[in-house]
Protein backbone atom coordinates (compact mmCIF):
# COMPACT_ATOMS: atom_id res chain seq x y z
CA UNK A 1 0.00 0.00 0.00
CA UNK A 2 1.25 3.48 -0.87
CA UNK A 3 2.46 5.61 2.02
CA UNK A 4 0.08 8.34 3.11
CA UNK A 5 1.37 11.69 1.89
CA UNK A 6 0.83 14.59 4.30
CA UNK A 7 -1.00 17.59 2.87
CA UNK A 8 1.19 20.45 1.66
CA UNK A 9 1.45 23.54 3.84
CA UNK A 10 -1.09 26.30 3.16
CA UNK A 11 -0.20 28.91 0.59
CA UNK A 12 0.97 32.29 1.85
CA UNK A 13 -2.06 34.58 2.25
CA UNK A 14 -1.43 36.91 -0.67
CA UNK A 15 0.52 34.62 -3.00
CA UNK A 16 -1.77 34.58 -6.03
CA UNK A 17 0.86 32.95 -8.26
CA UNK A 18 1.34 30.06 -5.82
CA UNK A 19 -2.37 29.23 -5.81
CA UNK A 20 -2.56 29.45 -9.59
CA UNK A 21 0.46 27.14 -9.81
CA UNK A 22 -1.42 24.51 -7.80
CA UNK A 23 -4.17 24.56 -10.42
CA UNK A 24 -1.75 24.47 -13.34
CA UNK A 25 0.02 21.46 -11.88
CA UNK A 26 -2.87 19.46 -10.43
CA UNK A 27 -6.26 20.52 -11.87
CA UNK A 28 -7.59 19.51 -15.30
CA UNK A 29 -7.56 22.76 -17.36
CA UNK A 30 -11.15 22.56 -18.60
CA UNK A 31 -12.11 26.03 -17.36
CA UNK A 32 -11.01 29.42 -18.61
CA UNK A 33 -10.44 31.15 -15.27
CA UNK A 34 -10.04 34.82 -14.45
CA UNK A 35 -6.90 35.86 -12.56
CA UNK A 36 -8.67 36.10 -9.21
CA UNK A 37 -8.03 33.91 -6.17
CA UNK A 38 -11.06 34.23 -3.91
CA UNK A 39 -10.90 33.42 -0.22
CA UNK A 40 -14.24 34.19 1.43
CA UNK A 41 -17.50 36.05 1.12
CA UNK A 42 -20.08 37.91 3.15
CA UNK A 43 -23.51 38.94 1.94
CA UNK A 44 -23.25 40.15 -1.65
CA UNK A 45 -19.48 40.59 -1.50
CA UNK A 46 -16.52 38.31 -2.22
CA UNK A 47 -12.91 38.85 -1.15
CA UNK A 48 -9.67 37.67 -2.71
CA UNK A 49 -6.58 36.49 -0.86
CA UNK A 50 -4.99 39.94 -1.10
CA UNK A 51 -7.95 41.51 0.72
CA UNK A 52 -9.66 43.15 -2.25
CA UNK A 53 -13.47 43.30 -2.09
CA UNK A 54 -15.80 42.61 -5.03
CA UNK A 55 -19.52 43.25 -5.37
CA UNK A 56 -20.82 39.92 -6.67
CA UNK A 57 -23.40 40.51 -9.38
CA UNK A 58 -22.62 37.14 -10.96
CA UNK A 59 -23.73 35.01 -8.02
CA UNK A 60 -21.59 32.05 -9.01
CA UNK A 61 -23.64 31.82 -12.26
CA UNK A 62 -27.06 32.25 -10.61
CA UNK A 63 -26.25 29.93 -7.71
CA UNK A 64 -25.76 32.08 -4.60
CA UNK A 65 -29.44 32.78 -3.99
CA UNK A 66 -28.87 34.25 -0.51
CA UNK A 67 -25.38 35.58 -1.09
CA UNK A 68 -22.31 34.37 0.78
CA UNK A 69 -21.99 32.97 4.31
CA UNK A 70 -25.69 33.49 4.99
CA UNK A 71 -26.35 32.55 8.63
CA UNK A 72 -29.51 30.59 7.80
CA UNK A 73 -27.61 28.32 5.39
CA UNK A 74 -24.77 27.88 7.88
CA UNK A 75 -27.30 27.01 10.59
CA UNK A 76 -29.05 24.46 8.36
CA UNK A 77 -25.72 22.84 7.41
CA UNK A 78 -24.59 22.55 11.03
CA UNK A 79 -27.93 21.45 12.44
CA UNK A 80 -28.58 18.73 9.83
CA UNK A 81 -24.98 17.47 9.79
CA UNK A 82 -25.26 16.83 13.52
CA UNK A 83 -28.22 14.53 12.79
CA UNK A 84 -27.38 12.68 9.57
CA UNK A 85 -25.71 13.72 6.32
CA UNK A 86 -26.35 10.76 4.02
CA UNK A 87 -28.47 7.61 4.10
CA UNK A 88 -28.83 6.52 0.42
CA UNK A 89 -32.19 6.35 -1.30
CA UNK A 90 -32.94 2.88 0.00
CA UNK A 91 -34.55 4.63 2.96
CA UNK A 92 -37.04 7.40 3.63
CA UNK A 93 -36.12 10.64 5.37
CA UNK A 94 -38.20 13.70 6.13
CA UNK A 95 -36.20 16.52 4.46
CA UNK A 96 -36.52 14.99 0.96
CA UNK A 97 -40.25 14.46 1.34
CA UNK A 98 -40.79 17.97 2.65
CA UNK A 99 -38.71 19.55 -0.12
CA UNK A 100 -40.62 17.64 -2.81
CA UNK A 101 -43.88 18.78 -1.22
CA UNK A 102 -42.69 22.39 -1.22
CA UNK A 103 -41.63 22.32 -4.88
CA UNK A 104 -44.88 20.69 -5.98
CA UNK A 105 -46.85 23.35 -4.10
CA UNK A 106 -44.96 26.06 -6.02
CA UNK A 107 -45.38 24.46 -9.46
CA UNK A 108 -48.41 22.20 -9.65
CA UNK A 109 -49.56 18.58 -9.20
CA UNK A 110 -46.71 16.16 -9.81
CA UNK A 111 -43.67 14.58 -8.20
CA UNK A 112 -39.95 15.33 -7.88
CA UNK A 113 -36.67 13.46 -8.31
CA UNK A 114 -33.48 14.78 -6.71
CA UNK A 115 -29.92 14.70 -8.02
CA UNK A 116 -26.82 16.82 -7.61
CA UNK A 117 -26.72 19.23 -10.55
CA UNK A 118 -28.59 20.82 -13.40
CA UNK A 119 -27.27 18.50 -16.05
CA UNK A 120 -28.37 15.50 -13.96
CA UNK A 121 -31.84 17.01 -13.81
CA UNK A 122 -31.86 17.36 -17.59
CA UNK A 123 -30.60 13.79 -18.01
CA UNK A 124 -33.60 12.69 -15.96
CA UNK A 125 -35.93 14.51 -18.33
CA UNK A 126 -34.20 12.90 -21.32
CA UNK A 127 -34.75 9.46 -19.79
CA UNK A 128 -38.36 10.37 -19.04
CA UNK A 129 -38.87 11.29 -22.70
CA UNK A 130 -37.36 7.99 -23.83
CA UNK A 131 -39.52 6.03 -21.40
CA UNK A 132 -42.61 7.95 -22.50
CA UNK A 133 -42.08 7.30 -26.20
CA UNK A 134 -40.41 3.89 -26.03
CA UNK A 135 -43.30 1.65 -27.05
CA UNK A 136 -44.01 3.81 -30.12
CA UNK A 137 -40.37 4.15 -31.16
CA UNK A 138 -40.27 7.82 -30.21
CA UNK A 139 -37.04 9.05 -28.60
CA UNK A 140 -36.18 12.43 -30.08
CA UNK A 141 -36.03 15.66 -28.03
CA UNK A 142 -36.25 18.96 -29.91
CA UNK A 143 -34.32 21.88 -28.39
CA UNK A 144 -33.35 25.35 -29.59
CA UNK A 145 -30.39 27.15 -31.14
CA UNK A 146 -28.25 28.99 -28.55
CA UNK A 147 -29.67 26.86 -25.75
CA UNK A 148 -27.51 25.34 -23.02
CA UNK A 149 -28.43 22.10 -21.25
CA UNK A 150 -25.20 20.90 -19.63
CA UNK A 151 -21.92 19.21 -20.48
CA UNK A 152 -22.59 15.49 -20.32
CA UNK A 153 -22.70 13.73 -23.69
CA UNK A 154 -26.49 14.02 -23.82
CA UNK A 155 -26.30 17.56 -22.46
CA UNK A 156 -24.03 18.79 -25.26
CA UNK A 157 -26.09 16.95 -27.85
CA UNK A 158 -29.15 18.83 -26.57
CA UNK A 159 -27.33 22.16 -26.41
CA UNK A 160 -27.73 24.46 -29.40
CA UNK A 161 -24.14 25.75 -29.45
CA UNK A 162 -21.52 24.16 -31.67
CA UNK A 163 -18.61 25.25 -29.46
CA UNK A 164 -19.55 22.73 -26.73
CA UNK A 165 -19.78 19.85 -29.23
CA UNK A 166 -16.43 20.32 -30.95
CA UNK A 167 -14.12 17.35 -30.40
CA UNK A 168 -16.81 15.13 -28.89
CA UNK A 169 -18.45 13.89 -32.08
CA UNK A 170 -20.35 11.82 -32.91
CA UNK A 171 -23.17 13.32 -30.90
CA UNK A 172 -25.61 11.20 -28.92
CA UNK A 173 -28.50 10.67 -31.35
CA UNK A 174 -31.99 11.95 -30.70
CA UNK A 175 -31.53 15.72 -30.43
CA UNK A 176 -32.20 18.45 -32.99
CA UNK A 177 -32.21 22.24 -32.64
CA UNK A 178 -34.44 24.91 -34.19
CA UNK A 179 -34.52 28.71 -33.73
CA UNK A 180 -35.70 29.96 -30.33
CA UNK A 181 -39.05 31.79 -30.12
CA UNK A 182 -39.99 30.39 -33.56
CA UNK A 183 -43.12 28.28 -33.18
CA UNK A 184 -43.40 27.54 -36.91
CA UNK A 185 -39.86 26.13 -36.97
CA UNK A 186 -40.60 23.92 -33.98
CA UNK A 187 -43.82 22.64 -35.54
CA UNK A 188 -42.01 21.87 -38.80
CA UNK A 189 -39.30 19.96 -36.93
CA UNK A 190 -41.68 17.50 -35.24
CA UNK A 191 -41.22 14.03 -36.72
CA UNK A 192 -42.68 10.57 -36.03
CA UNK A 193 -39.63 10.00 -33.76
CA UNK A 194 -40.22 13.09 -31.61
CA UNK A 195 -41.12 12.47 -27.97
CA UNK A 196 -40.51 15.84 -26.30
CA UNK A 197 -39.58 19.50 -26.63
CA UNK A 198 -37.13 21.14 -24.19
CA UNK A 199 -36.63 24.91 -23.91
CA UNK A 200 -35.36 27.46 -21.40
CA UNK A 201 -37.87 30.04 -20.20
CA UNK A 202 -35.02 32.54 -20.46
CA UNK A 203 -31.98 31.47 -22.44
CA UNK A 204 -28.98 32.08 -20.20
CA UNK A 205 -25.74 31.06 -21.90
CA UNK A 206 -27.38 32.01 -25.18
CA UNK A 207 -27.62 35.70 -24.25
CA UNK A 208 -30.42 36.18 -21.66
CA UNK A 209 -33.36 36.04 -24.07
CA UNK A 210 -36.84 35.46 -22.56
CA UNK A 211 -39.41 33.31 -24.31
CA UNK A 212 -42.37 35.20 -25.76
CA UNK A 213 -45.76 34.48 -24.15
CA UNK A 214 -47.30 33.37 -27.46
CA UNK A 215 -44.36 31.02 -28.00
CA UNK A 216 -44.89 29.28 -24.66
CA UNK A 217 -48.64 28.95 -25.16
CA UNK A 218 -48.11 27.76 -28.72
CA UNK A 219 -45.64 25.09 -27.60
CA UNK A 220 -48.14 23.79 -25.06
CA UNK A 221 -50.81 23.62 -27.75
CA UNK A 222 -48.40 21.90 -30.16
CA UNK A 223 -47.40 19.29 -27.57
CA UNK A 224 -51.04 18.59 -26.73
CA UNK A 225 -51.85 18.19 -30.42
CA UNK A 226 -48.89 15.93 -31.23
CA UNK A 227 -48.91 14.07 -27.89
CA UNK A 228 -45.42 15.29 -26.96
CA UNK A 229 -43.96 16.12 -23.56
CA UNK A 230 -43.09 19.78 -22.96
CA UNK A 231 -40.02 20.29 -20.77
CA UNK A 232 -38.60 23.51 -19.31
CA UNK A 233 -34.94 23.85 -18.35
CA UNK A 234 -35.17 26.18 -15.34
CA UNK A 235 -31.70 25.47 -13.99
CA UNK A 236 -30.56 29.09 -14.42
CA UNK A 237 -33.79 31.04 -14.83
CA UNK A 238 -35.84 29.34 -12.10
CA UNK A 239 -36.11 29.59 -8.32
CA UNK A 240 -37.52 33.13 -8.15
CA UNK A 241 -34.79 34.68 -10.32
CA UNK A 242 -37.44 36.25 -12.56
CA UNK A 243 -39.61 37.37 -9.64
CA UNK A 244 -41.75 34.21 -9.70
CA UNK A 245 -40.70 30.69 -8.80
CA UNK A 246 -40.62 29.72 -12.47
CA UNK A 247 -39.80 32.12 -15.30
CA UNK A 248 -42.79 30.97 -17.35
CA UNK A 249 -45.03 32.07 -14.46
CA UNK A 250 -43.60 35.59 -14.72
CA UNK A 251 -43.64 35.70 -18.53
CA UNK A 252 -47.30 34.64 -18.66
CA UNK A 253 -48.59 36.99 -15.93
CA UNK A 254 -51.77 38.66 -17.13
CA UNK A 255 -51.70 36.80 -20.45
CA UNK A 256 -55.02 35.13 -21.39
CA UNK A 257 -54.59 31.41 -20.77
CA UNK A 258 -51.32 31.97 -18.92
CA UNK A 259 -52.60 30.79 -15.55
CA UNK A 260 -53.44 27.38 -17.02
CA UNK A 261 -50.01 26.87 -18.59
CA UNK A 262 -48.01 24.01 -17.15
CA UNK A 263 -45.16 22.04 -18.75
CA UNK A 264 -44.79 18.29 -18.26
CA UNK A 265 -41.33 18.42 -16.71
CA UNK A 266 -39.02 21.05 -15.22
CA UNK A 267 -35.30 20.77 -14.41
CA UNK A 268 -33.92 22.79 -11.48
CA UNK A 269 -30.60 23.32 -9.68
CA UNK A 270 -28.27 26.33 -9.08
CA UNK A 271 -30.19 28.68 -6.71
CA UNK A 272 -32.08 25.72 -5.26
CA UNK A 273 -29.12 24.91 -3.01
CA UNK A 274 -27.57 28.36 -2.75
CA UNK A 275 -24.12 26.89 -3.37
CA UNK A 276 -24.69 23.45 -1.87
CA UNK A 277 -24.95 20.88 -4.70
CA UNK A 278 -28.51 19.81 -5.43
CA UNK A 279 -30.55 19.35 -8.59
CA UNK A 280 -34.12 18.24 -9.15
CA UNK A 281 -36.70 17.63 -11.79
CA UNK A 282 -40.44 17.93 -11.39
CA UNK A 283 -42.81 15.79 -13.46
CA UNK A 284 -46.48 16.60 -14.04
CA UNK A 285 -48.96 14.23 -12.43
CA UNK A 286 -49.98 12.12 -15.47
CA UNK A 287 -46.33 11.14 -16.06
CA UNK A 288 -44.97 11.23 -12.51
CA UNK A 289 -44.80 7.44 -12.13
CA UNK A 290 -43.22 6.62 -15.50
CA UNK A 291 -39.81 6.16 -13.88
CA UNK A 292 -40.57 3.28 -11.54
CA UNK A 293 -38.27 1.44 -9.15
CA UNK A 294 -34.94 0.60 -10.77
CA UNK A 295 -35.33 2.85 -13.83
CA UNK A 296 -33.37 5.83 -12.50
CA UNK A 297 -31.23 6.70 -9.49
CA UNK A 298 -28.26 8.45 -7.94
CA UNK A 299 -26.18 7.78 -4.84
CA UNK A 300 -26.06 11.29 -3.37
CA UNK A 301 -29.23 12.85 -4.77
CA UNK A 302 -31.71 14.22 -2.27
CA UNK A 303 -29.52 13.67 0.78
CA UNK A 304 -30.85 14.87 4.15
CA UNK A 305 -28.20 17.60 4.19
CA UNK A 306 -28.85 18.94 0.68
CA UNK A 307 -32.61 18.93 1.19
CA UNK A 308 -32.38 20.62 4.59
CA UNK A 309 -30.35 23.44 3.02
CA UNK A 310 -32.79 23.83 0.11
CA UNK A 311 -35.74 23.92 2.52
CA UNK A 312 -34.08 26.61 4.60
CA UNK A 313 -33.41 28.71 1.49
CA UNK A 314 -37.07 28.45 0.45
CA UNK A 315 -38.09 29.46 3.96
CA UNK A 316 -35.88 32.57 3.89
CA UNK A 317 -37.02 33.55 0.38
CA UNK A 318 -40.67 33.33 1.34
CA UNK A 319 -40.33 34.80 4.84
CA UNK A 320 -38.31 37.79 3.61
CA UNK A 321 -40.46 38.22 0.49
CA UNK A 322 -37.43 38.05 -1.78
CA UNK A 323 -39.56 37.50 -4.89
CA UNK A 324 -40.82 41.07 -4.40
CA UNK A 325 -37.23 42.20 -3.85
CA UNK A 326 -36.19 40.57 -7.13
CA UNK A 327 -38.88 42.50 -8.99
CA UNK A 328 -38.12 45.84 -7.36
CA UNK A 329 -34.33 45.75 -7.32
CA UNK A 330 -34.26 43.99 -10.69
CA UNK A 331 -36.39 46.74 -12.23
CA UNK A 332 -34.08 49.41 -10.78
CA UNK A 333 -30.98 47.61 -12.03
CA UNK A 334 -32.45 47.13 -15.50
CA UNK A 335 -33.52 50.78 -15.66
CA UNK A 336 -30.04 51.88 -14.63
CA UNK A 337 -28.45 49.67 -17.28
CA UNK A 338 -30.81 51.06 -19.93
CA UNK A 339 -29.81 54.60 -18.96
CA UNK A 340 -26.14 53.68 -19.39
CA UNK A 341 -26.91 52.16 -22.80
CA UNK A 342 -28.58 55.42 -23.83
CA UNK A 343 -25.67 57.48 -22.45
CA UNK A 344 -22.83 55.38 -23.89
CA UNK A 345 -24.07 53.84 -27.18
CA UNK A 346 -20.53 53.39 -28.49
CA UNK A 347 -19.85 50.90 -25.67
CA UNK A 348 -23.20 49.45 -24.60
CA UNK A 349 -25.89 48.27 -26.99
CA UNK A 350 -28.95 46.63 -25.37
CA UNK A 351 -30.33 45.24 -22.11
CA UNK A 352 -32.71 42.31 -21.81
CA UNK A 353 -34.02 39.86 -19.24
CA UNK A 354 -36.36 39.73 -16.25
CA UNK A 355 -35.93 40.24 -12.53
CA UNK A 356 -32.36 39.57 -11.47
CA UNK A 357 -31.45 37.74 -14.66
CA UNK A 358 -30.24 40.49 -16.96
CA UNK A 359 -28.00 40.59 -20.01
CA UNK A 360 -26.02 43.65 -21.11
CA UNK A 361 -24.92 43.46 -24.75
CA UNK A 362 -21.74 45.30 -25.64
CA UNK A 363 -21.37 47.34 -28.80
CA UNK A 364 -19.27 45.61 -31.48
CA UNK A 365 -15.60 46.54 -31.85
CA UNK A 366 -15.12 48.81 -28.85
CA UNK A 367 -12.01 50.68 -29.98
CA UNK A 368 -10.59 51.57 -26.58
CA UNK A 369 -11.23 48.21 -24.90
CA UNK A 370 -7.89 46.98 -23.49
CA UNK A 371 -6.78 43.40 -22.96
CA UNK A 372 -5.74 40.39 -24.98
CA UNK A 373 -7.39 40.75 -28.43
CA UNK A 374 -7.60 36.96 -28.68
CA UNK A 375 -10.16 37.07 -25.84
CA UNK A 376 -13.80 38.00 -26.42
CA UNK A 377 -15.01 41.51 -25.68
CA UNK A 378 -17.15 40.11 -22.87
CA UNK A 379 -14.14 38.54 -21.14
CA UNK A 380 -11.99 41.64 -21.57
CA UNK A 381 -14.79 43.86 -20.25
CA UNK A 382 -15.34 41.54 -17.28
CA UNK A 383 -11.63 41.84 -16.48
CA UNK A 384 -11.93 45.63 -16.43
CA UNK A 385 -14.86 45.36 -14.03
CA UNK A 386 -12.84 43.07 -11.77
CA UNK A 387 -10.21 45.75 -11.50
CA UNK A 388 -12.92 48.15 -10.34
CA UNK A 389 -14.39 45.67 -7.83
CA UNK A 390 -17.38 44.21 -9.70
CA UNK A 391 -18.06 40.59 -10.71
CA UNK A 392 -20.30 39.70 -13.67
CA UNK A 393 -20.61 36.62 -15.91
CA UNK A 394 -19.81 36.63 -19.65
CA UNK A 395 -22.26 34.97 -22.03
CA UNK A 396 -20.85 34.42 -25.48
CA UNK A 397 -18.61 37.03 -27.08
CA UNK A 398 -20.62 40.20 -26.48
CA UNK A 399 -22.85 39.84 -23.41
CA UNK A 400 -22.37 40.28 -19.68
CA UNK A 401 -24.85 38.58 -17.38
CA UNK A 402 -26.07 40.00 -14.08
CA UNK A 403 -27.19 37.08 -11.89
CA UNK A 404 -26.80 38.41 -8.34
CA UNK A 405 -28.14 37.00 -5.08
CA UNK A 406 -31.91 37.35 -4.74
CA UNK A 407 -31.44 39.50 -1.63
CA UNK A 408 -29.41 42.14 -3.48
CA UNK A 409 -30.14 45.52 -1.92
CA UNK A 410 -31.11 48.63 -3.89
CA UNK A 411 -28.01 50.40 -2.60
CA UNK A 412 -25.82 47.55 -3.86
CA UNK A 413 -27.47 47.65 -7.30
CA UNK A 414 -26.73 51.38 -7.37
CA UNK A 415 -23.13 50.66 -6.38
CA UNK A 416 -22.82 48.19 -9.25
CA UNK A 417 -24.18 50.74 -11.72
CA UNK A 418 -21.74 53.36 -10.43
CA UNK A 419 -18.78 50.99 -10.87
CA UNK A 420 -19.98 50.02 -14.33
CA UNK A 421 -20.19 53.65 -15.42
CA UNK A 422 -16.71 54.34 -14.05
CA UNK A 423 -15.41 51.62 -16.38
CA UNK A 424 -17.58 52.51 -19.38
CA UNK A 425 -17.05 56.28 -19.45
CA UNK A 426 -13.33 56.22 -20.41
CA UNK A 427 -14.05 53.70 -23.18
CA UNK A 428 -16.57 56.09 -24.72
CA UNK A 429 -14.39 59.18 -24.42
Feature annotation, model-predicted:
Residues 2-429:
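Conserved N-terminal phosphate-binding loop of PLP-dependent enzymes in the Aspartate aminotransferase
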Amino acid sequence: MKDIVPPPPPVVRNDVAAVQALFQQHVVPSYGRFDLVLSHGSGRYLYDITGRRFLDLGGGIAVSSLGHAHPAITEALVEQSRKVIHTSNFYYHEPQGRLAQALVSLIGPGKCFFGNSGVEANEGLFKLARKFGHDEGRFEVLTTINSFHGRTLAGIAATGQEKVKKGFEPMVPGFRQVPYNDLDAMRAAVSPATAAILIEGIQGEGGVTPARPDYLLGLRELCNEKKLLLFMDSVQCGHFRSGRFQSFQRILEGVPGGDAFLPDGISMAKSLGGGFPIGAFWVRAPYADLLGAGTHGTTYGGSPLACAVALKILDVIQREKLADNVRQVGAALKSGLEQLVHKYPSVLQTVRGLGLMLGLELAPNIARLPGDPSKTQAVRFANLLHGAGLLTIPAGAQILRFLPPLNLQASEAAEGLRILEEVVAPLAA
